[in-house]
C-alpha cells in the first residue's frame, strides 16, 4: 500500500514563499501526516478555505460608509478595504489571507485526489474524490470572485485569471501562470460537474460542514448564474440545479425568518440560530478565522467604516413593494429587526447574523483568535438565484420568477400582498435612480450582458433589492456590484449624520482586488 506525506505548512511555502528553505526544513518533521486510502478523507477537513470574504466584500461595497475621524477603524486592514487600497496587511479577513487559505485548501484537495488516483480510483473512494473536486472548484471560485473581473463571455479569453492548481506540488517556490478567466471558469465547471454526483451525504458525521449533494447543487446554481453565456444557456443550468435544492415546494425549505426575528437582539442567540446546523435552510456552513463578528457587530469597534443609518435606508430599513420599515419592531415589514447603537451619531445598524467566537490564546495577556461561522450556501439564496435566472430568460418566464420572489417575500416580510410583474414594473419604473442628494435602492446597471427592456430591468432591481437586504453582512452584495457594473460611491458622513464629501467608483476595472504582493511574480 502506498503512503503519501502532506505538510500543513508546505502549501504556504509553495505559494507565497513566506518561509525560507531553512525554516521549512526545520518544520518538516513535525508537520507530516501519512495518507493512505483508509484515512485520506481526513485531509478534506482542510479542503475548505478558512478565510471568509465577508469583511473585504462588505467594506468594499455600498453597504459601508465612512464616519468622522473621531471614530476609529478596527485596524489598518479595515481602512484599506473601505478605500479600495492595495493592502499590505496579512491578518485574518485580508485578501492575502484569502489567497493563502484558498490555495492551502486546494493543496489538500490535490493531495486527496492523488491518493485516490494512485489507489486505482475504486468506487469506495468516490465520496472522497467527489468532495475534493467540488472543494477545489469552490476555492478557485472564491478567488476568482475577489481577484478577477466578473465573467463576461466577450472578454474572459483575455481577462486575467488566477492560477488553477490541479497537481500536487513537488518543488518549492514554483512560478504559476495565472491564465485567463475563461480557463478558470472552464476548470471550475469541469471539477464541479465531475465531483457533485460522487458525493455521498451519509459519510459525514456533521454534513452541514461539508459539501453535501444539495450544497454542491446550490454552488452550481450560483456558479452558472455568474457564468453568463451568449445564448443564455447558463440560466437553464441555474434552474436545473436550484430545482434539485428546492424541490417541488420552495416555501417548505426556506428559512423561518419570523421565528429568527422573534429571538432576543442581545447576545449571540440570533446569530447562533442563524448558523444552526440543524436548520434545513443552511446547506453549507464554513468556519473561518475572522474578526468580522467584532468589526460589523454591536460593539464600539470599527465604527469609522460601518453600515449605519443612511446605508440602512437602502437595506434593512428600506421600504419596498412589500411595505415600509418601522421603528416599531412589531409593525416593521421585515421579520428580522435591526440592532442599532444609540450614540449621538449612530454608526451601526445591523442584522444579528454573525457571532464572534473566541479561541483563547493567552488568558493572562487576554489575546484571542477570532472565528465566525459563515452560511456559505442557503436555500434562500438559491431561491433568488433561480428567480434571477427566470428573469434573465425573458417574458415567457417572468411568472416563475414572480413565484420565487413571492416565496421570498412571504418568508422574509410581513407582507400579504402578492408581487406581480406589473406592480414591480410600476414601482421600480417610477423610482428615480440613485443620486447622492437623493439616494434610492435603484442604481444604474452596466452589466456585460444585455438587459432586454425596462420591464426586465425593473424586475432585476427588485431581485437585487431583495438579495441585498437578505444577505446583508455576508459579502454577496459586492459580487452583485461586480456582475451588474453598479456605480457606487465612497460616502463620508458628517457629524450631523448627513452626507459630506464623496468619491464615485464607477470603473468596472476597479471591481477587482489586487492579488497579494507575494503572488505578483505569477506570469
Q: What would you call each of these model-derived segments?
A:
Residues 235-380, 415-450, 460-462, 470-471, ...:
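Hydrophobic-face positions in mid-chain alpha helices that act as interaction patches
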Residues 146-187, 231-236, 240:
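Short coil/linker segments at helix-helix boundaries
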Residues 21-66, 300, 485-513, 523:
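Membrane-proximal, proline-rich intrinsically disordered regions
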Residues 1-19:
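Sec-dependent bacterial lipoprotein signal peptides
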Residues 199, 203-230, 236-239, 243:
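Aromatic- and glycine-enriched pocket-lining scaffold segments that form the walls
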Amino acid at each position: 500500500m502506498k503512503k503519501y506525506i502532506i505538510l500543513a505548512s508546505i502549501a504556504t511555502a509553495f505559494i507565497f514563499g513566506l518561509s525560507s528553505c531553512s525554516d521549512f526544513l526545520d518544520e518538516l518533521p513535525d508537520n507530516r501526516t501519512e495518507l493512505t486510502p483508509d484515512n485520506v478523507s481526513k485531509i478534506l477537513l482542510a479542503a475548505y478555505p478558512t478565510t471568509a470574504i465577508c469583511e473585504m466584500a462588505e467594506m468594499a461595497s455600498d453597504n459601508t460608509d465612512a464616519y468622522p475621524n473621531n471614530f476609529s477603524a478596527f485596524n489598518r486592514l479595515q481602512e484599506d478595504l473601505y478605500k479600495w487600497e492595495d493592502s499590505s496587511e496579512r491578518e485574518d479577513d485580508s485578501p492575502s489571507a484569502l489567497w493563502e487559505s484558498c490555495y492551502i485548501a486546494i493543496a489538500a484537495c490535490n493531495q486527496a485526489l492523488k491518493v485516490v488516483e494512485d489507489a486505482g480510483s475504486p468506487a469506495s473512494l468516490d465520496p472522497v474524490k467527489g468532495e475534493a473536486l467540488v472543494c477545489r472548484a469552490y476555492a478557485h471560485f472564491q478567488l476568482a470572485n475577489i481577484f478577477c473581473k466578473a465573467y463576461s463571455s466577450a472578454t474572459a479569453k483575455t481577462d486575467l485569471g488566477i492560477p488553477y492548481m490541479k497537481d500536487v506540488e513537488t518543488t518549492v517556490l514554483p512560478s504559476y501562470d495565472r491564465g485567463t478567466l475563461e480557463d478558470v471558469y472552464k476548470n471550475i465547471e469541469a471539477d464541479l460537474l465531475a465531483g457533485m454526483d460522487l458525493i455521498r451525504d451519509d459519510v459525514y458525521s456533521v454534513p452541514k460542514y461539508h459539501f453535501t449533494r444539495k450544497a454542491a447543487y446550490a454552488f452550481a446554481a450560483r456558479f452558472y448564474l455568474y457564468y453568463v453565456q451568449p445564448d443564455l444557456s447558463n440560466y437553464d443550468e441555474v434552474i436545473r440545479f436550484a430545482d434539485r435544492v428546492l424541490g417541488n415546494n420552495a416555501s417548505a425549505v426556506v428559512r423561518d425568518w419570523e421565528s429568527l426575528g422573534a429571538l432576543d437582539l442581545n447576545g449571540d442567540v440570533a446569530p447562533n440560530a442563524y448558523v444552526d446546523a440543524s436548520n434545513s435552510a443552511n446547506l453549507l456552513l464554513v468556519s473561518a478565522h475572522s474578526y468580522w463578528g467584532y468589526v460589523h457587530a454591536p460593539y464600539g469597534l470599527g465604527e469609522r467604516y460601518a453600515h449605519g443609518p443612511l446605508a440602512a435606508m437602502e437595506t434593512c430599513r428600506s421600504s419596498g413593494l412589500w411595505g415600509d420599515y418601522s421603528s416599531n419592531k412589531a409593525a416593521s415589514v421585515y421579520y428580522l429587526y435591526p440592532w442599532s447603537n444609540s450614540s449621538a451619531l449612530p454608526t451601526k445598524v445591523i442584522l444579528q447574523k454573525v457571532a464572534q467566537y473566541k479561541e483563547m490564546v493567552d488568558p493572562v495577556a487576554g489575546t484571542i483568535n477570532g472565528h465566525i461561522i459563515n452560511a456559505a450556501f442557503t436555500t434562500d439564496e438559491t431561491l433568488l438565484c433561480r428567480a434571477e435566472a427566470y428573469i434573465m430568460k425573458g417574458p415567457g418566464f417572468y411568472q416563475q420568477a414572480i413565484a420565487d420572489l413571492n416565496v421570498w417575500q412571504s418568508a422574509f416580510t410581513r407582507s400579504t400582498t402578492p408581487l406581480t410583474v406589473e406592480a414591480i414594473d410600476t414601482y421600480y419604473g417610477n423610482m428615480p435612480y440613485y443620486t447622492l442628494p437623493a439616494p434610492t435602492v435603484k442604481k444604474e446597471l452596466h452589466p456585460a450582458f444585455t438587459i432586454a427592456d425596462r420591464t426586465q430591468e425593473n424586475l432585476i432591481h427588485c431581485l437585487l433589492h431583495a438579495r441585498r437586504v437578505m444577505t446583508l453582512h455576508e459579502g454577496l452584495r459586492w459580487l452583485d456590484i461586480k456582475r451588474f457594473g453598479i456605480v457606487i460611491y465612497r460616502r463620508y458622513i458628517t457629524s450631523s449624520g448627513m452626507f459630506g464629501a464623496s468619491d464615485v467608483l464607477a470603473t468596472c476595472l476597479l471591481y477587482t482586488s489586487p492579488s497579494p504582493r507575494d503572488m505578483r511574480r505569477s506570469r
